[in-house]
């Protein structure tokens, strides 16, 4: 059952300047009267029309007097045939005014009219005749410039091509880029609001919400004469503002940020992408005329929170550094995030080649905010992603190395190159490039041992024949250690990297020892001489605030955070057991962020400490960084290698680096002589030692009570 009265509501926002005459004559610009006069001339029955005039601006306060009543009476008496409702908003802005008008609309359909525009006499009759539920009706538009009308404008030409058609709204996204010429069901209009913070482009952001409605149609009827919207073109209109960084860049990026909050129901049409590209077109045009503002524009996009825009071709600088990163933002992966942190810490312009990881990894678009300021060229390689399949790895490596070589040729090469594994394809691509460009300095980082797995046994990886295999083997044969044997592609990749990288980066000394001890002493010495021990990259300070999270903590309790997979018999299980037995356990709250929160909740449902837990799913990386800054303590646990073949524990959790930059106390649950146990920790307990874990809770409680004094 519809609660709307038959007919159409016409919403007219009208700005009222603070500079008004005492007689009220200048309260509203005279152009409003022209708009109302065009409504008075409509051929439709007037009882089917309600006119909502929304006065807004500083001058509205002056109308809350006798003058206001006189003005209202004067307006309605001048247009007695119109059902005019006058609404007022002290806050200026067409978006706010339209929101007030939309919320107040009572008729079944709604349309918008700017106060300096007009409607031809048959506009409402023609539009209402074709209007229907689930349909947006599009009508012609003519331009008026200095009193002269022009039907042959670019927008009307596009509307003309649709005459007589009914199609999905997403098939013509350009229709959503303006307020005029549309009649929509009021029920749909009232589902959404104009963004009142946008200084321009609020019409695009508002109408783009229609892409969220399944099955919504666009109807463009064949209408007769005198059925067009009459748009007044002025040099000072919002859409025709003088070119400036604020309007052409900042405001367009703000609009794009709003567009990205919309969930498109038919993404195959790429309608949202089209609207975004239209907005970004303003940015590109401006930067082509003002190339020195390019870095400022990119930094503005990052500050606003708009990642992944196509800045390539707008920079004048070239990158002197090449990066091969098999997994890279926007793909959600620890390796991708660490490489992004390295790039941001280095603060050097780079070209990056990475693999299409769509089949095996989700996307975290926000992580591009980390690297966007430093990307000159970022190219995704079309290859089947695989951790261990040699053919798939080689496909990426060959393509990436070839494309990088072509780009290097066009810009006098690269000074340096960085690759990181795990995801061994990064090192394979770098090795192929290095073989053809020996003058490029290669920095190769190992996050973990490559040739062996977490238990210390060799990783299985069949080394099949092929061009890449031949090239990699040839590199070994041309070295001073051609006699070293290898049986898997992981072993071959590790060996070639150790031989040819100009700098080999290990995350800790144990890892360096474990990786090198399988090789001859002279090779070990050779690699050590060019090695660097560098812990996982710590996020820069601003990275913790690139995204603001709204996760709530309990201000009356001590909040402990744990991000990672949960194993009751390892590490974090110690905290759970300590909470079970601590005499003041109710003063603590353990927040767990894990990959399978529902499963973990079921497993721990009957645990005595369950009431002290908050179990959540994983967060996007930058959201996690921001949330991490609000805890009282963050828990990181060691990898237990007691049942492995390792002589020492080679694993340093990358999470430690993320925690240590947060400014929050880090609680390490460690095993003897591990890399983590040798790093600065605010709190520490040995894995499996519940008494020590309880002591950490005691210390947290003492700190909380001291700070509360």
Regions found by a protein language model. Name each.
Residues 29-48:
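Short, acidic, metal-binding catalytic loop of nucleotide-sugar glycosyltransferases
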Residues 86-105, 541, 546:
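Glycine-rich, basic loop-to-helix element that forms the pyrophosphate-binding segment
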